[in-house]
Structure formats: structure tokens, C-alpha cells
């Protein structure tokens, strides 16, 4: 269709973005001129819509030209056969010419490569030829008035001559031709006015009779034009609505696709692709299994680097929260860049400890060289910073080459990690190293092939673990200062005297923020930012772009459509083939081959059904006026007309009430179909009643007659006369009475075509049985079979239109439904990715980044005044961990650790522990915190006791969980817990692989509470005891304990919970008996047997012993 709503889609689907005030005002001024010829204000969007409707418009044009060709051909054939008729007019001999013209346009239109401009030109030519055809059908009498005898060459021109041809052409131009709405309306008005004017001036007749006939003709023209305008406007509005709905779904789909790409990139930045995709699939569709799935891979030839910033603790303690996060992000952001340059993968950041692996995701033969280069670059970076600020900062680096197991453990807050004895040794190498030196083992040295100068490292003199295992170490000797980072003008920033920590910290932050030196990215900024401006514009929310989905307003201007969305739709339209889409429909019934889709299609509400009934009521009123003007009065017809009008009024009232009351399902497809059929039959019965009253039923057997016609043998034959002079108008009313079928859009074409067949058959039977064709139609028309040709052509046009509308609506729905399904799929993917994202970051942190503007994104950090921090370690897990061929070099040991951590994670799924946030796992150490949800300071102070109580209960229940695992797995693991409370800083650092963490003295002390604690006990600080002493817990004072960096600290053991009377109801201790509680998650893992005696912890283990490389030292790095 051509004309279209301006900036919206009728009744729904949304319009677009409102323009400025000036453009809106201009649109309002033009509204009066363009109300019936609506289109999108955006030319690009309008062109898309034209392309969207091209094939359907081409099919409609073919149908229109076929009907017009049949019409002109039938009239030409009648002329060729020399059928008697009225006096010769201007149309004499023009019908064959018009038939040829319409057929020529039909051939041109059938060209597959026809484009929108060519189709519009074909439609305009067809309309022009239709206009000349209609004008020539007007009653222009060239032969003068009749000589009083029907036997003359022709009778006088009549007022009814050419009316049915004009009615048919007018309807076809509205319903099927691809011309603008204003052009179609103008055509209809010109045709009607021309016929009325010619009739009034050229047709000889008695004035009273002529004016009544002109009035009846005018009413019929009004009815056809009214129906045509309704069909044209609402058909196009519904199509534009479907187009905008599909576009909205595609827009949402693209927006969701971009969001999913961001989330996918985030996921890929945190985990290797192969691990991430496998975990994602299992996370969304958890397989049924007894054990939790472990995501561990083995790599036999890699190099591991551990690095620690020496002197960072004192500097960080003087920083504000924002400065600390900036410090960490700038430093580790630079380290991430260096890691990428040197083909290393950063694994984790632990306080100020940074470790990475080379040769992990992509095997490399020079992985040892890469790690050495990485270590030297890190030292150069810190050296540059130290020289610029005169702060005593340095880097201690340790390397080892060997085997690792990499992957993730647990069910929540996944973090990629590596485990093995070789990882532990690399960590020990860092601890035993010296500032400014790269400390390597003999194994790594052998992989360097003599490419670096080395010197003895004497690591065994500084570390007992190296001495015990007789490990020889070396230092890399750099030949010269390898990298001087530009952007540091030392003379401008070196102070004359030593600066205070606060000044140094501020200067360091500003210095590292210099883009020339450190191009550290904001975490998530590379993930959350789109690639180009067009893409960003296309990602605006649908509520901003499509504001009027429930109403079709012509004054809404679509000013700034998403260019990217339009380009995507354009590509879809290029690939779209209507024939391929028709494959989803049954060719004869046009039903969807998928039953479910057919059912959903029938559930759509017909928003124009009430309007169609109102229009039918108006048509009934027009029939009443025509009846009163020219038909003889009949009680039966009058009663039928009154009943028809009353029934239609009742239908309108019923539909209005149900719409106001919002009765669900009150107008199903079955009810709509039955009402449509009954209404059409009823309105048609009124016209058929007029026909019956005007036909010669009572005189068909009488010999007396005043009418003389020529028989086929050339003899004059006397035939009976008709009982009224308005037979032709009765037949015209029958033709117009079938038009209501065209305005019930949501009624399927099959029942319409069946009904049309019945009405046409009854029409022909009435004419044949009445003797009308044998009388030759009396004085009305000399062409006895012309009414039959008229009803057949009308029925053909209505059937083709019904099928075209049905195809159009079904294909529109199919395209919109497919777009909606894709959008829903992407929405599901988005929700799934968001679930995974919330499993990687705390919910409030993830939401912060999802809602942030990528252009203005800043570092995320948050200061908390009171947070409970817990470290829970299994110190004797290192005795269990062993690397043998029989356990796949330690994989089976990690499988059991995964079960333990997963069961701890499952505890957090309880609603009681919803405030606890898992931070990470460090080897066999589990770190969690409570009170990190953003709250006001007052609320935080009031709730800290309850928060700590929740954390304490969680720690107590962790002992129960570990006891059950011990019972089921023949082990005797022992838990050791430390809890502290105080201020912390939370934030996200690391641009390439963002990581959420918490820092502060509170975290360090909580780690020391674990490392200095006693196995099987929960050690807490004095502050925790003070906050929980009024709660139902039993505490035992341990006394003062020496804590690194803090001196002597008074600590307490939390022994368990007590009831209201002080009786201990839940205790902790090494001597307690382990009792199976029968948790469902652990049943069936192992047959219940008596646990083995506890394994004692070996004395003299280093801070990072085999199997758990970071429970105490690295975990307790001061932030």
C-alpha cells in the first residue's frame, strides 16, 4: 500500500522518537493535508517500509489488474457479440483497448525485479486507465433519444448505466492498487461526481424520477467510497503497526545482542573461552550428577610468575578509598598490558601480589622467556614510578617452570586459578627473592637456553622450604635499564625535601593517571562501551524510541531512527523472499502449518472489529435511504431492514461494553467469524429482498404483456413487464451488500470465500428462477446477463482482496512473531548471562556497571565503615594433596576440594545467609564478608551486630558441612576460621580481567586471625567479641597473640551458640565427635564408614606449602 501513517503504527507497535518543537509544530500544520495520506517522517524508515511491503504490493497489483482486465474483457466480449443495450456511448470500442492496456500492465507488474518506484508508476498508470475507463462508462448518449421502440438499435441512456462498473473500479483502486491514499480518494470522488454530473445533464428522464435515481446512485457511491477509505487506511495502518512492532523487536534484539556481547566479553575476560562456555552451558542447564562437576585442565609445560610490590603496604595505608583503588587499577592495569605484550595470562590479584602464567591458553615454546621479560618489565615499571616520586617502591619477582592444573572451583564467584606443587614453588621463589630481582629456579634456567646472564640466588639461605627440598635458585642479571617510560618529567615533580605520605600518594595517583605513561583502562569500560556512535544510538531503550505502542498517532514524528537497526532491517529485506515465507502457510487455507502458531494468531484481538460493525450499520442506513427513495414499499423488506439496523446497534453496544469492561476472551475468532457471516447475510438479505420484490415472479406464466423484444429467430415476442422500475438498483444493492466482507480483517479468507460463493449462487438462482434473464431485464438493461457478470466480478474482486489481506496479515504476524521469538531468545540469553555475571560479581556491583554510562564510567569503589570479614582455611589439606599418576597428577584431590567449596557455596543459598558475600577462594582458603550491600551509615551501624551474628552462624555451619564430607569421604579435614570487623574498601580493578576485591587493615587482620588460629576453632578479634557478647554465643578468651604488623592482639575463640539459659547447644572443638546429619547433597557419595583418625599438621611448613599456596601469606598481603 502507498499511503501510510505518519510516524506510527495503527493501534500499537510504537511510533518512534518525538522530534523537536519546531518539527512537531510543522507536522501539526500539515496534519490537515496529510491526515489520509500518512507516512513516516523519516525517509529512511519510509523506504524500509516500502521495501517491506514491496512483494505484497506487487501481488495486490497483479490481482487488481487481473480484475480490471476481466472487467474490460467481459464488456468488450459483450460488444463483440452485439448484445442489445442502451444507445451507443463514448465507451463503444474502448473496452478492448482498456483490456489490452490492463493486460500489458499485468505483464510488466509480473517482472520479478520490479522495484518500489516502478511499482508505484505501474499503480499510477493503472489508476489513470481506470479513470478513463470509468469516465467512458458514464451514460454519454451519442445516438440521441430513443424512438419509443425497444426494437430500435438501442434504447435511451439510463441513470443506472455504468454504475456497477464504476463501483467495482472504485473499490479495486482503494483496496488493491499501490497508490497514495489521497490519490485513491480523489479518484473515487472524481468518478462518482463525473457519473452524477453526466447523468444529471445528459440522461433524458422525468425530473422527479431522475433526482430520486441520482440520490440512490449518490448513496451507493458514498457507501463504496466509505468502505474503500476504511479498507485503505486501516489496512495500511495495521501493516505499519506490524512493521513497527517487528522493527521494535529487532531493535530490542540488537540491543540485547550488544548487551550479551558485552557480558560475553566480560565472561571471556574472567575465564578462558573454553572453560567459560562449558561452565555457562552447565550453569544454565545443570546436569544430574552426584558430584559437582569440576572444571580443571592440566598443562604440563608452562612458566609461573609471582610478583609482590615491596613497600606498597605503608603507601596504601595512607590513601583514601578512591586513591587506593586508583593506585591498584593503574599499577595492575599496566601489568595487564605488559602481560598481554609478553604472552602471559594474569591469573589473580591478591592484595599487592600479582601472578600470571605463560603458555597456558596458547602453548608456547618460549614461555620461560616470556615470563622473564614480564618480570623485568614489571621491575622497570615500578622503578620508573619510584624514581618519579622518590617513594621506596620495588618489585620482588619469582619464577618457576613446570606443571599446573588450571580452572575454577565452587559454585559461586568463579575465579580462574592454578594449582600444583610447581605453583607453590613459584610462590616460594617470590617470597625468597630480593627486591628488584627476578628469582628463577634451575628448571626455568634450563628453558632459557643461556639467553640471559644469571647469578646465584642463594634462595635456600632465606627460605627453609628451598633448603629442605635442595632447590638451587638464580637471579636474572639485566644488562642495562631496559625501558624508560615516557611522560615522566622528573625535574618537574621531584621535591626539594622528602614529602609526606599523603602528598606522595596524591602525586603517585596523578602521575600514574598520565595517559602518556600508563594507558590503564577503567575496568569494564572496554566491555561496556560500544564500538561506534551509531551502535550506541541504536541501543537506546525501546521505551524512548517507541512511545506510543498502544495508539496510532499521525502527529508523532520519527526523527532519529536507529541507523544500525535500519541497516539491519534493510539486509533482512534483501534476503526476505515472500515465497519462502509462504512455505509456512497452507496454500489453499492460508493456515499456518504450525498448529501452535495458528492458535496464537487466532488469539490476536481485532481492534477494528467494532469499527467494521459501525460501518456496516451506516451501510444499512444507506440502504434504508435508497429503499425509501426508489423502491416500492414492502412490509417484509421494511421489517428486515429494521431488524438489521436494531441488531447492528445491539452489536455495537455489546462490543463497546465488552471493551470498556475489558472482558477477557469475550470476542474469540469463532465469535467474530459467526458475527461477520451473520451480519453480511443480514445486510445482503435486505438487498436481496428488494430484488425479489422487483422481479416478475407473479407474472412469469401470464401471456399478456406490453413489452416486445426480438427473439433469437428475429421474431417479435411479447414478454411480461416488471413489477417496479428499480430492479437495477436492487441488483446494485446486492453488489454493495457484499462489501462488508472486505472490512472484517481478522476473519480468515476461507469462510469469506465460502460465504461469497453462497451469496453469488443465491443471486444467480434468484435471477434465473424469476425469469429476469429471459425477460432481458425489462426496461432497465438490454444485456440480460450483465447482472450475473457484475456479481461474478464483484465476488472475484472481494475473494482476491480477502485472500490478499489474509496473506498480508499472516505474513506480517509471522515476521513480527519471528522477530519477537528472536528477541525473547536474546532476552533469555541476557538473563542467563546476567545470572552468570551476578555469579562473578556481587549483585549491586554488577548492577552498577550495567546501569553506568560507558562514556562517563569511572572506577568503582566503595568505602564501608563496618564489614565483617571471614577467612576459613583447611590447613591440613596440603597433607591430602599429592600428585601421582593414579590421581591424574592431583586432579582427584582438587575434585574433593571442589566438593568442599561447592558445599560451602550452597550454604549461601539459604535465605538466612543472603547478606553474606563470597569474595574468593585462595587455594583451600575460603574468604567471605558481610555488610557489603550499599546502605546508609546509620543503618550499617545498627545492623553490624546482626551481620556478624549471621557470619558467625555461617562459620559454625561450615564445620558441620566439613564434618559430613569427612564422614562420607574417609577423611578428617579440619577447619580453621578467623573473623574480624572494621572498615574496608571494595572495588573493581584490572581493565583486561576485572576483579572484585576488598582491601584494608580489617582484611589483613582477619587473615591473621585465620593463620594464627587453632585448627577446629573460630578465632575472633576483641572488636568482634564486643559486638557479639550480648548475642547467644559462647566465647573463650585465648589471650594475646602475636600478629604480624600489629604486635600483640587480644583474641577470643567462638566456641558455639547457646540457648537462652546459657547452655551450650552447638559447640566447636577438635575433640568433638563427627555425626552425619544426612544432608541430601552428600548422600550416596560414599557408603557410611567410620572416619579415619585426624591427620596431624607437619611442623615447619612454609607459608605456601604444596597444595595450598596462599592460605596465609598471600592472603594476608596488606592492601
UniProtKB/Swiss-Prot annotation:
Binds 2 magnesium ions per subunit. Is also active with manganese (in vitro). Residues 1-19 have a biased composition (Gly residues). Detected in zona glomerulosa and zona fasciculata in the adrenal gland (at protein level). Brain, retina and adrenal medulla. CDD domains: CHD. One of its GO terms (biological process) is regulation of circadian rhythm. It is found in: Membrane; Cell membrane; Cytoplasm; Membrane raft. Mg(2+) 1 binds at residues 308, 352. Mg(2+) 2 binds at residues 308-309, 352. GO terms for cellular component: cytoplasm; extracellular exosome; glutamatergic synapse; hippocampal mossy fiber to CA3 synapse; membrane raft; plasma membrane; postsynaptic density membrane; presynapse. Residues 493-520, 1024-1047 are annotated as: Interaction with calmodulin. GO terms for molecular function: adenylate cyclase activity; ATP binding; calcium- and calmodulin-responsive adenylate cyclase activity; calmodulin binding; metal ion binding. Its main location: membrane. It is a multi-pass membrane protein. N-glycosylated. The keyword Lyase applies. Residues 1-63, 235-610, 795-1119 are cytoplasmic. Belongs to the adenylyl cyclase class-4/guanylyl cyclase family. Interacts with CALM. It is linked to Deafness, autosomal recessive, 44: A form of non-syndromic deafness characterized by prelingual profound hearing loss affecting all frequencies. This is Adenylate cyclase type 1. It comes from Homo sapiens.
Amino acid at each position: 500500500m502507498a499511503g501510510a501513517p505518519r510516524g506510527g503504527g495503527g493501534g500499537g507497535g510504537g511510533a518512534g522518537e518525538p522530534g523537536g518543537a519546531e518539527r512537531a509544530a510543522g507536522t501539526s500544520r500539515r496534519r490537515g493535508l496529510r491526515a489520509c495520506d500518512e507516512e513516516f517522517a523519516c525517509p529512511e524508515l519510509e523506504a524500509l517500509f516500502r521495501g517491506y511491503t514491496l512483494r505484497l504490493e506487487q501481488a495486490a497489483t497483479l490481482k487488481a489488474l487481473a480484475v480490471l482486465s476481466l472487467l474490460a474483457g467481459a464488456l468488450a466480449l459483450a460488444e463483440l457479440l452485439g448484445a442489445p443495450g442502451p444507445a451507443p456511448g463514448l465507451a463503444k470500442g474502448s473496452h478492448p483497448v482498456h483490456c489490452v492496456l490492463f493486460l500489458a500492465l499485468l505483464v510488466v507488474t509480473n517482472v520479478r525485479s520490479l522495484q518500489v518506484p516502478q511499482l508505484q508508476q505501474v499503480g499510477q498508470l493503472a489508476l489513470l486507465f481506470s479513470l478513463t475507463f470509468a469516465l467512458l462508462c458514464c451514460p454519454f448518449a451519442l445516438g440521441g433519444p430513443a424512438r419509443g421502440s425497444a426494437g430500435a438499435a438501442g434504447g435511451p441512456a439510463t441513470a443506472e448505466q455504468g454504475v456497477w462498473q464504476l463501483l467495482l473500479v472504485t473499490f479495486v483502486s482503494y483496496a488493491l492498487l499501490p497508490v497514495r491514499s489521497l490519490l485513491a480518494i480523489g479518484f473515487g470522488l472524481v468518478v462518482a461526481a463525473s457519473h452524477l454530473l453526466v447523468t444529471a445533464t445528459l440522461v433524458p428522464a422525468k425530473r422527479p424520477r431522475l433526482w430520486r435515481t441520482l440520490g440512490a446512485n449518490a448513496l451507493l457511491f458514498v457507501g463504496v467510497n466509505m468502505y474503500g477509505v476504511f479498507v485503505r487506511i486501516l489496512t495500511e495502518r495495521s501493516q505499519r503497526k506490524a512493521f513497527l512492532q517487528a522493527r521494535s523487536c529487532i531493535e530490542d534484539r540488537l540491543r540485547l545482542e550488544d548487551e550479551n556481547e558485552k557480558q560475553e566479553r566480560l565472561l571471556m575476560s574472567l575465564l578462558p573461552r573454553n572453560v567459560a562456555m562449558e561452565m555457562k552451558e552447565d550453569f544454565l542447564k545443570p546436569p544430574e550428577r552426584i558430584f559437582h562437576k569440576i572444571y580443571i585442565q592440566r598443562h604440563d609445560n608452562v612458566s609461573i610468575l609471582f610478583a609482590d610490590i615491596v613497600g606498597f603496604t605503608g603507601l596504601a595505608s595512607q590513601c583514601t578509598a578512591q586513591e587506593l583503588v586508583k593506585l591498584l587499577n593503574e599499577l595492575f592495569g599496566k601489568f595487564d598490558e605488559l602481560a598481554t605484550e609478553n604472552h602471559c595470562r594474569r591469573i589473580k590479584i591478591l592484595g599487592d601480589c600479582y601472578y600470571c602464567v605463560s603458555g597456558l591458553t596458547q602453548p608456547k615454546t618460549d614461555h620461560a622467556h616470556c615470563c622473564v621479560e614480564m618480570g623485568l618489565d614489571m621491575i622497570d615499571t615500578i622503578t620508573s614510578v619510584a624514581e618519579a616520586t622518590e617513594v621506596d617502591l620495588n618489585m620482588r619477582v619469582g619464577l618457576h617452570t613446570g606443571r599446573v592444573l588450571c580452572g575454577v572451583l565452587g559454585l559461586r564467584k568463579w575465579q580462574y586459578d592454578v594449582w600444583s606443587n610447581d605453583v607453590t614453588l613459584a610462590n616460594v621463589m617470590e617470597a625468597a627473592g630480593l627486591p628488584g630481582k627476578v628469582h628463577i629456579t634451575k628448571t626455568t634456567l634450563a628453558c632459557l637456553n643461556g639467553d640471559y646472564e644469571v647469578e646465584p640466588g642463594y634462595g635456600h639461605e632465606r627460605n627453609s622450604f628451598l633448603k629442605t627440598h635442595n632447590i638451587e635458585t638464580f637471579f636474572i642479571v639485566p644488562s642495562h635499564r631496559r625501558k624508560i617510560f615516557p611522560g615522566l618529567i622528573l625535574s618537574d615533580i621531584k621535591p626539594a625535601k622528602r614529602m609526606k605520605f599523603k602528598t606522595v600518594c596524591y602525586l603517585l595517583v596523578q602521575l600514574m593517571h598520565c595517559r602518556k605513561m600508563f594507558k590503564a583502562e577503567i575496568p569494564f569500560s572496554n566491555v561496556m562501551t560500544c564500538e561506534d556512535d551509531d551502535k550506541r544510538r541504536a541501543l537506546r531503550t525501546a521505551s524512548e524510541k517507541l512511545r506510543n505502542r498502544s495508539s496510532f498517532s499521525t502527529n508523532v514524528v520519527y526523527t532519529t531512527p536507529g541507523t544500525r537497526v535500519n541497516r539491519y532491517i534493510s539486509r533482512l529485506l534483501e534476503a526476505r523472499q515472500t515465497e519462502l515465507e509462504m512455505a509456512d502457510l497452507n496454500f489453499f487455507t492460508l493456515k499456518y502449518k504450525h498448529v501452535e502458531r495458528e492458535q496464537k494468531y487466532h488469539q490476536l484481538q481485532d481492534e477494528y472489529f467494532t469499527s467494521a460493525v459501525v460501518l456496516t450499520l451506516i451501510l444499512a442506513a444507506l440502504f434504508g435511504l435508497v429503499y425509501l427513495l426508489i423502491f416500492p414499499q414492502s412490509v417484509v423488506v421494511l421489517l428486515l431492514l429494521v431488524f438489521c439496523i436494531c441488531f447492528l446497534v445491539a452489536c455495537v453496544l455489546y462490543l463497546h461494553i465488552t471493551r470498556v469492561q475489558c472482558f477477557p476472551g469475550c470476542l474469540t475468532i469463532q465469535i467474530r467469524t459467526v458475527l461477520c457471516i451473520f451480519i453480511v447475510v443480514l445486510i445482503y438479505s435486505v438487498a436481496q429482498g428488494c430484488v425479489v420484490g422487483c422481479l416478475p415472479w407473479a407474472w412469469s406464466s401470464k401471456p399478456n404483456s406490453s413489452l416486445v423484444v426480438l427473439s433469437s429467430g428475429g421474431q417479435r415476442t411479447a414478454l411480461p413487464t416488471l413489477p417496479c422500475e428499480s430492479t437495477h438498483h436492487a441488483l446494485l444493492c446486492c453488489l454493495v451488500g457484499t462489501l462488508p466482507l472486505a472490512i472484517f480483517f481478522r476473519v480468515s479468507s476461507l469462510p469469506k470465500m465460502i460465504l461469497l460463493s453462497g451469496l453469488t449462487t443465491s443471486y444467480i438462482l434468484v435471477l434465473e428462477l424469476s425469469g429476469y434473464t429471459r425477460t432481458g431485464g425489462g426496461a432497465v438493461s438490454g444485456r440480460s446477463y450483465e447482472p450475473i457478470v457484475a456479481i461474478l466480478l464483484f465476488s472475484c474482486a472481494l475473494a482476491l482482496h480477502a485472500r490478499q489481506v489474509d496473506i498480508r496479515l499472516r505474513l506480517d504476524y509471522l515476521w513480527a512473531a519471528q522477530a519477537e521469538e528472536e528477541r525473547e531468545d536474546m532476552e533469555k540469553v541476557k538473563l542467563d548471562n546476567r545470572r552468570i555475571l551476578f555469579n562473578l560479581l556481587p549483585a549491586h556491583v554488577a548492577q552498577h556497571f550495567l546501569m553506568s554510562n560507558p562514556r562517563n564510567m569511572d572506577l568503582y569503589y566503595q568505602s564501608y565503615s563496618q564489614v565483617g570479614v571471614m577467612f576459613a582455611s583447611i590447613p591440613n589439606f596440603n597433607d591430602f594433596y599429592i600428585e601421582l599418576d593414579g590421581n591424574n597428577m592431583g586432579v582427584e584431590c582438587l575434585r574433593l576440594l571442589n566438593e568442599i567449596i561447592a558445599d560451602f557455596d550452597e550454604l549461601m543459598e539459604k535465605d538466612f545467609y543472603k547478606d553474606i558475600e563470597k569474595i574468593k577462594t585462595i587455594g583451600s582458603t575460603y574468604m567471605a564478608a558481610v555488610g557489603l550491600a550499599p546502605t546508609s551509615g546509620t543503618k550499617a551501624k545498627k545492623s553490624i551486630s546482626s551481620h556478624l551474628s549471621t557470619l558467625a552462624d555461617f562459620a559454625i555451619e561450615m564445620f558441620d558441612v566439613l564434618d559430613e564430607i569427612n564422614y562420607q569421604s574417609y577423611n578428617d579435614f579440619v577447619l580453621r576460621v578467623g573473623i574480624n570487623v572494621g572498615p574496608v574498601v571494595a572495588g573493581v580493578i584490572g581493565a583486561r580481567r576485572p576483579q572484585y576485591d576488598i582491601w584494608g587493615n580489617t582484611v589483613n587482620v582477619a587473615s591473621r586471625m585465620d593463620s594464627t588460629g587453632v585448627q577446629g576453632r573460630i578465632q575472633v578479634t576483641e572488636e568482634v567479641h564486643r559486638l557479639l557478647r550480648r548475642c547467644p554465643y559462647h566465647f573463650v578468651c585465648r589471650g594475646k597473640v602475636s600478629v604480624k604488623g600489629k604486635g600483640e592482639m587480644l583474641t577470643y575463640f567462638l566456641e558455639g551458640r547457646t540457648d537462652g539459659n546459657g547452655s551450650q547447644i552447638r559447640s566447636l572443638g577438635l575433640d568433638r565427635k563427627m555425626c552425619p546429619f544426612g544432608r541430601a547433597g552428600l548422600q550416596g557419595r560414599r557408603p557410611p564408614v567410620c572416619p579415619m583418625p585426624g591427620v596431624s599438621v607437619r611442623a615447619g611448613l612454609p607459608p605456601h606449602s604444596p597444595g595450598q599456596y596462599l592460605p596465609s601469606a598471600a592472603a594476608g598481603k596488606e592492601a
